[in-house]
A protein has these predicted regions:
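Rossmann-like NAD(P)-binding element
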Residues: 44-73, 78
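Short, charged/polar "capping" segments at the starts of alpha-helices
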Residues: 33-37, 88-89, 134-136
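Rossmann-like NAD(P)(H) cofactor-binding subdomain of soluble oxidoreductases
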Residues: 64-113
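NAD(P)+-binding Rossmann beta1-loop-alpha1 motif at the extreme N-terminus of oxidoreductases
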Residues: 1-44
Length: 141
């Protein structure tokens, strides 16, 4: 399974590192970490073959990223955000399968350099329901 992560700060970086440790094919998209590794760039086109994409950008950029992803992803792609607020991202219909989520994890630090693969171990992860049509996607998430 190919999984994308947009935004490689503490949360996105930790998702990225955890998935890599589990041997998933992971693609990172980040302006600040562009080129850090072979599988990290700032090119959204690299996400087009992903079955799932996590959006872990700062809240003020999340809606723009979710809209931009519509240009690159097929409608079968599952996209999950990690914002702590849900209404502003949930009130829109997207071309792909969107699941609003919120990981209940973090530290006092920010940035990829402070991310670590164990951040979510033992943590709760809230998955918000957007209706019965989303049940299949929620089970995949």
């Amino acid at each position: 399974m190919k999984i994308g992560v947009v935004g490689l700060g503490l949360i996105g970086g930790s998702i990225f590192k955890a998935l890599e440790a589990l041997n998933y094919d992971v693609i990172g998209v980040s302006d600040s970490q562009n080129g850090l590794q072979e599988n990290i760039s700032n090119d959204f086109n690299n996400l087009k073959d992903c079955e799932m994409v996590f959006v872990a950008t700062p809240m003020n950029k999340t809606l723009d990223v979710l809209q931009k992803l519509e240009e690159y992803l097929p409608k079968s792609t599952i996209v999950a955000d990690t914002c702590s607020l849900k209404e502003f991202v949930s009130n829109k219909n997207y071309k792909y399968n969107f699941i609003p989520t919120h990981p209940m994890a973090g530290t006092e630090f920010k940035g990829f350099e402070h991310s670590f693969k164990e951040l979510f171990e033992g943590a709760k992860w809230v998955v918000c329901n957007r209706g019965l049509a989303q049940e299949k996607n929620n089970s995949l998430a």
